[in-house]
Amino acid sequence: DKSDTTNAVVQAKPLCFNQLWDMYPHTTLEASGLAVGLPEGQMGNSEVGHLNLGSGRIVYQDLTRITKDVESGEFYNRPVMKELYEVAKKQSLHLIGLVSDGNVHCSLDHIKAVIKGAHDNGIEHVYVHALLDGRDVAPQCAQGYLKDLETYMADLNCGKIATVSGRYYAMDRDNRWDRVELAYNAIVHGQGEIATSACEAVQQSYDKDAADEFVLPTVIDAAGTIKDGDAVIFCNFRPDRGRELTKALVLPDFDGFKREPLSIYMATMTKYEDGLP
């Protein structure tokens, strides 16, 4: 639409592009929502675009498939989830995930679904290791999502936030292991910044002019660290930024930084990589 004042290409008035448009057959593509296998109204992203273009057809995304599974109840019947809850009954359940409604890497609704399953299975010790966004959503909006999650858990009387960490640390994808190590140490060893609540941890970061993605790994509840025998689920459905922390938690020959191997049951929302849960 050449009258679209929000379209940068239109506003640039590119002579060559406009000539091609006027002289040759052309069409347009939808890049969001149901047209690319996402929920209605959900924006697309690079991974979604590449997958649909390369496939030449609509590919229903992990976000959509998992959401449908949750709505139908099939989510809780999957063997991995059943095993996760069975192991957690003996000790503790830990959820790691990006707490926002950006829906690019993780869905807050999926995190809530796992917590509801824990409640329905009578699991007493449920801890959330909240990763903060600030990239797929506004730079400083984490407190709203954290309060929403805390309210949900309080209503169920199930779960508490044990640690928070900006995605800059916990969701690195370029082998910058010094960042991942900080997140790992908070989640496993209870080492890092200290705060009495998740929102306080975020505010401490804001006071230092650091937005959500740069919140230093912070311990809220030292009793909520991952220990041998615990059950862990990484709730991110997009693999690329979940791999490194997962490797640190489960690979026996991990060499990104020094740490003692854990004996845990770990699941991930999707297959991150061959050799990982």
Residue ranges and their predicted role:
Residues 238:
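Conserved phosphate/oxyanion-binding catalytic-loop motifs
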Residues 94, 231-233:
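Conserved beta-strand elements of the Class I
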Residues 88-89, 226-228:
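Flexible, charged surface loops at secondary-structure boundaries
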Residues 53, 234-235:
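Short hydrophobic-aromatic micro-motifs
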Residues 2-168, 178, 182, 254-277:
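Active-site nucleophile/metal-coordination loop of metallo-enzymes that catalyze phosphate/sulfate
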Residues 137-227, 234, 242-261:
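Long, well-ordered, tryptophan-enriched scaffold segments
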